[in-house]
Amino acid sequence: MMNTYQMYLGLTRPDNETITTEQFNAYTKEVLDTLFDGYTISDAVGNWKGEREQTKIVSVCTEYKNLVQKAANLYKEFFEQDAVAISTLPALELV
């Protein structure tokens, strides 16, 4: 079943260092571009354990939840994140 998944990717490492634009772009090229035909990235401000941080929301429409989970796990690994939130929504119709 096709769904729209949104991954919430925080841009602050546990040591309070910021993930740079270059580092995030490398992740998109190495991971997102290889797993998905297309996706949308939005900027947001999130809150994790009482701390606000810059966040990227990656929206992807796919029937392969396992690929979304893989992308989230790789982000956690690459950037030493505690968690990546994923929301699941009904898919938008592509016309």
What are these regions (language model features)?
Residues 1-95:
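Positively charged, small/polar-rich N-terminal and surface patches that mediate targeting and assembly
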